[in-house]
UniProtKB/Swiss-Prot annotation:
It is found in: Cell membrane; Endoplasmic reticulum membrane. Expressed at low amounts in liver, brain, testes, and kidney (at protein level). Expressed in placenta. Its main location: membrane. GO terms for biological process: monoatomic cation transport; phospholipid transport. The keyword Cell division does not apply. This is Phospholipid-transporting ATPase VD. The keyword Endoplasmic reticulum applies. The active site is at residue 438. InterPro entries: ATPase_P-typ_cyto_dom_N, ATPase_P-typ_P_site, ATPase_P-typ_TM_dom_sf, ATPase_P-typ_transduc_dom_A_sf, HAD-like_sf, HAD_sf, P-type_ATPase_IV, P-type_ATPase_N. ATP binds at residues 438-440, 729, 771, 795, 838, 918-920, 993-1000, 1027, 1033, 1056-1057, 1361-1368. It is a multi-pass membrane protein. GO terms for molecular function: ATP binding; ATP hydrolysis activity; ATPase-coupled intramembrane lipid transporter activity; magnesium ion binding.
Amino acid sequence: MTELLQWARHHWRRLSHGRAQGEDERPYNYASLLACGGKSSRTPRPAGKHRVVIPHLQCFKDEYERFSGTYVNNRIRTTKYTLLNFVPRNLFEQFHRAANLYFLFLVVLNWVPLVEAFQKEITMLPLVVVLTIIAIKDGLEDYRKYKIDKQINNLITKVYSRKEKKYIDCCWKNVTVGDFIRLSCNEIIPADMVLLFSTDPDGICHIETSGLDGESNLKQRQVVRGYTEQDSEVDPEKFSSRIECESPNNDLSRFRGFLEHANKERVGLSKENLLLRGCTIRNTEAVVGIVVYAGHETKAMLNNSGPRYKRSKLERRANTDVLWCVLLLIVMCLTGALGHGIWLSRYENMLFFNIPEPDGRVISPVLTGFYVFWTMIILLQVLIPISLYVSIEIVKLGQIYFIQSDVDFYNEKMDSTIQCRALNITEDLGQIQYLFSDKTGTLTENKMVFRRCSVAGFDYCHEENAKRLESYQEAVSEEEECTDTLGGSLSNMARPRAQGCRTVPSGPLGKPSAQLSGSTSAVGNGEGSGEVPHSRQAAFSSPMETDVVPDTRLLDKFSQLTPQLLTGLDGTAQSSPLETLYIMDFFIALAICNTVVVSAPNQPRQKIGLSSLGGMPIKSLEEIKNIFQKLSVRRSSSPSLASGKDSSSGTPCAFVSRISFFSRPKLSPPMEDESSQMDEIPQASNSACCTETEAQNRAVGLSVSSAEALSGPPPSASNLCYEAESPDEAALVYAARAYRCTLQSRTPEQVMVDFAALGSLTFQLLHILPFDSVRKRMSVVVRHPLSKQVVVYTKGADSVIMELLSVAASDGTNPEQQMIIRERTQRHLDEYAKRGLRTLCVAKKVMSDTEYAEWLRNHFLAETSIDNREELLVESAMRLENKLTLLGATGIEDRLQEGVPESIEALHQAGIKIWMLTGDKQETAVNIAYACKLLEPDDKLFILNTQSQDACGMLMSAILEELQKRAQVSPELASSRKNFPQPSDAQGQGRAGLVITGKTLEFALQESLQRQFLELTAWCQAVICCRATPLQKSEVVKLVRNHHHVLTLPIGDGANDVSMIQVADIGIGVSGQEGMQAVMASDFAISQFRHLSKLLLVHGHWCYTRLSNMILYFFYKNVAYVNLLFWYQFFCGFSGTSMTDYWVLIFFNLLFTSVPPIIYGVLEKDVSAETLLQLPELYRSGQRSEEYLPLTFWITLLDAFYQSLVCFFVPYFTYQGSDIDIFTFGNPLNTAALFIILLHLVIESKSLTWIHMLVTVGSILSYFFFALAFGALCVTCNPPSNPYGIMRKHMLDPVFYLVCVLTTFVALLPRFLYRVLQGSVFPSPVLRAKYFDRLPPEERAEALKRWRGTAKVNHVASKHASQSAAMSGRPTPGSSAVLAMKSATVSTVEQSTRETALDRGCSEPGASKMTGSSAS
């Protein structure tokens, strides 16, 4: 509710929050109180002057005061007001709204005696009431924020005191930059701090960042390099270094700086060393850090931008019409002024009408007319709908409530429903014309399953794994069923007590329980400590993803990897085949080339609720930790490993000298046809005795035979939990584990991998070069434990890896063999992509120590740089990632989500043009497009894949010419069109699809080709942009939106989709497995793509229709009622006199006629949800804005003028010649106007419920009750008028009832006849669909069938006509490529048949070659 209140005042709050440093206030989002936001929705602030952080110690006192003492403390203040400034500041903010200023001007104007229209005090009442209500609401909200701020600021943490020389309890608000802070497990980090110590022996700290980015997976942060090898906790008194870093900014993914020791030695700092405010320490007993940013300068607080404000298309249209109403008001007031001047001129000589001023002066008619103009402004002010904007906001809140209450949006597996984060653009959901969708995680499940691989040029189909996936169904475990039976989700169960950070044994089944989803209660000290904490389950760890079935051929080859084979000391004449060593390196790369965190599956992750923070002393956690230290068993130590240090003992030189990983062995191909292409390589002569071999086996921990090891998974593998940042990494690690190459542990210094036949090997981790969208790859630099060589393992997109391969390999193969491997792998990659698999290439590089030292020196300079660090690091990575040796490729399957094809088809029928923007390769994207029905088998597909900008322009011209011929439109006629063809125009042209690659898209986005590109895409129903970067995605959305002037809707699930989500009219985030960045940046968040169809086709249609008609109704009722006052001016000399008491005039719009349109705007349903989903083409009415066109607005005003004429002159002629007074004449006018206005809404309503009727009758009764009470009790409220008994007298007069009935009938007759004729003679598609809802089920089904059949026949006929026209023309340069692509992509059934045949052929000799040639 707080967010709703914040949004209502967001547009004027921005102008008054620019305060400095600790006292500045920013809009606050209480959804994430401690973290204050998610992924930054604003452009990162440029770092200006660098920040120098000096330790808060006695020895640095003077320097500290000069630097760190000038920074803000950790106190936060999100309140806006104080007791002294509340009234003036709140009024200042409220008067930033133009409507409030307008009515304030009218109040002041009414205090001018010459233009006064009503009693002065009365005119102030409406504005005062509105301002008071909003002020009370703002005050209560601000007081609530004050209490929460106070609670947070008074939280306790451990801060090192330079006076007491120890850590003491200190409030968060007193923490300053330079303080040393000690945190325990499960504590929330109070400020941004650099990690200096961790109790973990490897210098690792685990944190949970769900408050920042929504990701529940644990993240690793590491101690600053040089502080890892500490035997004891860091002593602040011995800390003699200083920190220099960038100025505070809101970029959560970046931290640049360095730590400079007393000897001027520098150590680079990155985000891996930074603990952010709002995160929680997990699985680490204690950490120590130094504060670098505090309070409002922390990254979390800088990301707290509050709710974003967007204006909908309908709101912009309404604002334009408000200006037309202002113009109409001015015209009516000018008419009144001129009329009064003319009237006075006619009676200038008659003193009865020309009364002089008290001083005897006579005012000229011209000046009097000027005064009357302003009097008329006050009198007719209601023409500007003051209650319109308030009513719109109330209606939108009601619409949001019903959207969020729709059970069809509930995802039972994720226990989540739709989130409406933008509250003012619901109606735009009904007018979307372009949809931009990510692929992975949006259209697909984002459950990456290892499907196939290619190693050393040989394809491995994994047939058994394919069969498992086809028949796989995730079964609910007995434990989960029991949980559901006992009380639903864990969030609804009693919270377990907080536990220590040591490992707790898992349950009897050995399966991890669901992760805790709620906050725990405060740590108690009562009994019942026997509660077992629920264990957590990592993401990307469902059985479908983890249970990989190995390929038997590949497993047989990998089983040849024995200690004797590696060392060449088996006493035989054979040497190890090169292919086996390729396989070994391939799986090593899969296991270690990632950032996967390895942990036990049953480690508890307790959460601390805000309600318990204030009363939870730190010593409670310490007591619980001590209990578990006494009760738990020490972590079992790993077996003896061959780390870089250990393996050098003994006689390593002799051992390593005899190992030749790439020492000219020969390939041993399994297929005859492929083996003929590879030359044999001379053997290496190696010999040794058995005794030496056994010693070496013991040195590397090889204690089991390969046959025994391969018979089952390693004993410890089932106890490991992999937490990956992306599902691809997890899938590759699980695939390596399936081949008994198990990632056992990872620290900042080393990675341990367990081989079935070799035991555990420890790789010294030298560097990790993370993935980025520029390089499209990641690498790890390790020192091999056996060869002692520096090896670079790289994985990434095939488009970039293939360009980085070395011509002359250093592994004993000649260039011809490398070329054969490369060509085979490329054929396999193309085949994988055509099957819709996600592809990656794996490569390696061996470096000498000299080469590595030279690269390291340059890389160190990049790491310690603050300015341009990202660019320098990319350049350094590119210097390393070259001259690679290709090891193989992987194909990972990511299945479509349930209901995606049906949703895509429905959105197509709704006239929405859909673009797929993906980073995958072309073949994969096209295959998924066919699978999800974005493309149909008979669609004409055009491919844009060029290497130059000129070629791109020529190809686009050729494709455009072909499309124009297919549409039977000459190029001259097409080029003469001012506007591009819209989606609805393309229905009769035959469907066309366009595929464009990332590099070609870069050319197309150039200014010289933008218009041509947009014109081409406007002719296509579907566009696929593959290999697109996040920046290109946002540029495409902006280009289409700005040039076509259409409403755009991007949808995505990952951080790479945030940019395009933010630049569009409506952004949709999918809450998937890649964190919550997209959700936090979106306007609406859903859990599955199929929910989008109902959100747009049903709720979008309803919201647009309701709000459009409600806005038109407000204009109608205000114009109709104000014109009664205007027509009366013709009979009172345009004097600005009202025939209605001002109290009635005020409440007529604010009370008697305001509630029914609000109910209409919330509950109106022109067509049922079932019909809207079955007939998606009804959505096109919203795209064409049929409910609210400019013509509709002016027709509504003309109808209002007509009804006001009838409402005025029927009573006028009825009472003409009678002796009734002015207010007695005005009473039947008001009563008839009330009936006309309320019944007008009844005629416009498509679905009347008991709520509609109750509100309508209630409005009428409240009017009569008020009129009777006012006439009896408020006789002298508005002197000199006397309303005593007016309504009572009229209710006793039959003529009054006759006048009201006759007036209402005559006024509404044209509107009623128009609606009758519209529904019977020329019904719109929406009205026809409305009739279907009234039919019995059998007749309704038959009617819908006829509707769809007619639409299908028309569509097929138009398609056949366009295809015949296309066949008569000459083919374009792109058509041959299209035919090739279409021939390679078939329907779903044919594709499954072909895949089965390929799988069978893959296991037979010679089949791989045949498959590769056919694919090429």
